[in-house]
């Protein structure tokens, strides 16, 4: 929040949700809601291997005051379209708060067509946002918006991008309502967005161009890289990841990371 984040989303892909215990997940959601204290929205990640488990997490998140939910369809076994629609109905009904439909690639994600995303919003009461991260995501964002024109305005509240913010400028031109990157350079990500909203596109693009090398590394290494950046910034003490984890950084990666961060350091807020 000190870095200027407009909201907090936990625990999801960038926060290693897949290797957390059920109690750890609940602790993270509760702690975040308590610390945010209503200053920014908190969106609780409730993706699991089954609808039953996700419903349990959704109910918990709604009970303790989370502002919304985000979920990919269950990844234990691939669900049918009808099962996916039912999944989003049930987690929304359990939490009774707005739901982000996360469209993400395998193995953890399930790629959903734009028409399926719109169908979910039609049939699931609380599903009103999309987080789009599949292949050709920018064009998918545009197609979802086109198909969603049939919905009442209150049923489609917008799409957000992801993918470490690599396509943020293009996404903005396509009408997204935000982006959900990792937290390691949230001050820079938020600054780019704020500049765009202020009509200062040239400044936004200049900062974006400086951040792209790090965004590319983020996309390559995922949470291994996020944690390395957070440690180098003095925000966390340990950058270990749980097994199974991603590819570890080597000495060349660290040299490149140091070079990139030195150029971005003037833009840090914390």
Where are these regions (language model features)?
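Residue-level recognition of short, structured coil/turn motifs
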Residues: 37, 96, 125, 152-153, ...
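Conserved, mostly hydrophobic/aromatic
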Residues: 32, 61, 91, 130, ...
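Catalytic alpha/beta core domains of metabolic enzymes, predominantly
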Residues: 105-219
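Structured C-terminal cap/extension of enzyme domains
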Residues: 1, 169-270
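Active-site beta->alpha loop and helix N-cap motifs at the rims of alpha/beta catalytic domains
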Residues: 1-109
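N-terminal cationic-hydrophobic initiation segments that often serve targeting/anchoring roles
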Residues: 1, 33, 92, 121-122, ...
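General structural feature for long, well-ordered alpha-helical segments within catalytic domains
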Residues: 24, 28, 53, 57, ...
